[in-house]
Every structure is written in structure tokens, then in C-alpha cells.
């Protein structure tokens, strides 16, 4: 089992660096600041995504988005944002930030190996967000993204004394023939909840400009 895939699956919220067919709806920013916990209705306790991957025998090799030969994966860089390199972030992860701090966007790609149902896998992609401290759900979707199985969740949570707003999308695309390799692509955008409204234009530009397509 390659550790990179499972470590990254749980790292996005912890690092705070961190369409949609119809595009995400405008968040209710007032509700972002509240700490009243809300979680999606479910009959079972959420299984952390990393645990689900491990239990399903799925392994993955990290690949830099710009090194893919059979898939196009990219996000735009809004004015005032720049690429960020940090020792605690894998070099294969593309990270951009505004003025070198929050808000941030993190883009990760993994080449997958294992026998799994992509449509079922993405159903577990939102679990980690719902398990965050005082998580409040704003929006979620299980609709395909550019024709590929996908899940999206948006909400706010507490971390290290701060209230954060997060948008997280997981996509399981298939590369072009002949290999038709399957990948896990994750985009996470994180901002301070109190700055979510002022930063909305930049964040929406990243979300709407997120591209996943076979070459």
C-alpha cells in the first residue's frame, strides 16, 4: 500500500490548504460563521476516506498535474495569487495562495491501482469534511464532473481556534486510450470564514475554472 494516497486523503483539512454541471450555488456566508454542527443525513457513521481506500485495497502513486500525459488537470490562478512551495507539502501537489497565506487552493492527482467501483468510491469522498470539528454543511453533490464520477462538499469547521470555510471536490477520471488509466483528483479550496465573502470572486473563479479531461 502506498502511503502517499492515504496520507493525502486526510491531510487537506489538517493542512488548511486545503462544475460542476450547474456550478456551485452562492454560499450563505452568514451561516459559515456559526458553530452549530450539521452533518449530512446518513444511516451509518462516516468512514474516513483514507480508511475506505485502505479497506478497499486501493493504492495510488502521486503525479504532478502538469506531468500527466493522458489527462488534463488544471486550475486557474487568480490575480494576486501565486504558487506556494512548502516542505510539508509533496512536490507533486499544486498549491496556490493569495499573498502566500489563506485563502489557498490545493490540487492533487494520484494514479490508482486496485479493483474498485469509482461510483461507490466517490460516495466516501466527503466523509473527512463531515468529521471535522463543528462542521456545518453548506452544499454537497454526488453528480458527475465533466462526465466522471465525483463528489463535492462545501462547509465550515473549526481548526486551531479559527473558523474556516472549505470547498472540496474529488473526481475519479479515466485517461485516454489505450491505457485508460484511472486517477483520483482532489481540489480543496480553504479560506477564513470571516473572509469568505470578500474572497468569493477568486474562489469561484478557481472552482469554475477547474478542469479534468482526457487528452
Please state what every model-predicted region is.
Residues 126-174, 178:
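Signature of long, low-cysteine stretches enriched in small and polar/charged residues
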Amino acid at each position: 500500500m502506498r502511503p502517499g494516497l492515504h496520507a493525502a486523503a486526510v491531510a487537506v483539512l489538517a493542512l488548511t490548504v486545503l462544475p460542476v454541471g450547474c456550478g456551485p450555488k452562492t454560499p450563505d456566508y452568514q451561516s459559515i460563521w456559526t458553530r452549530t454542527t450539521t452533518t449530512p443525513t446518513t444511516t451509518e457513521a462516516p468512514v474516513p476516506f483514507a480508511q475506505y481506500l485502505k479497506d478497499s485495497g486501493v493504492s495510488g502513486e502521486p503525479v504532478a498535474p502538469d506531468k500527466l500525459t493522458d489527462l488534463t488537470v488544471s486550475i486557474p490562478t487568480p490575480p494576486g495569487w501565486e504558487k506556494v512551495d512548502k516542505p510539508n507539502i509533496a512536490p507533486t501537489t499544486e498549491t496556490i495562495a493569495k499573498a502566500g497565506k489563506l485563502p489557498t487552493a490545493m490540487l492533487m492527482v494520484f494514479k490508482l491501482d486496485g479493483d474498485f467501483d469509482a461510483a461507490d468510491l466517490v460516495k466516501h469522498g466527503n466523509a473527512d469534511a463531515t468529521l471535522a470539528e463543528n462542521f456545518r454543511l453548506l452544499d454537497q453533490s454526488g453528480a458527475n464532473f465533466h462526465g466522471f464520477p465525483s463528489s463535492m462538499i462545501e462547509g465550515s469547521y473549526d481548526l486551531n481556534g479559527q473558523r474556516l470555510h472549505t470547498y472540496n471536490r474529488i473526481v475519479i477520471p479515466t485517461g485516454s486510450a489505450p491505457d485508460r488509466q484511472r486517477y483520483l483528483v482532489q481540489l480543496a479550496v480553504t479560506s477564513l470564514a470571516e473572509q469568505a465573502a470578500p474572497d468569493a470572486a477568486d474562489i469561484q473563479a478557481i472552482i469554475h475554472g477547474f478542469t479534468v479531461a482526457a487528452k
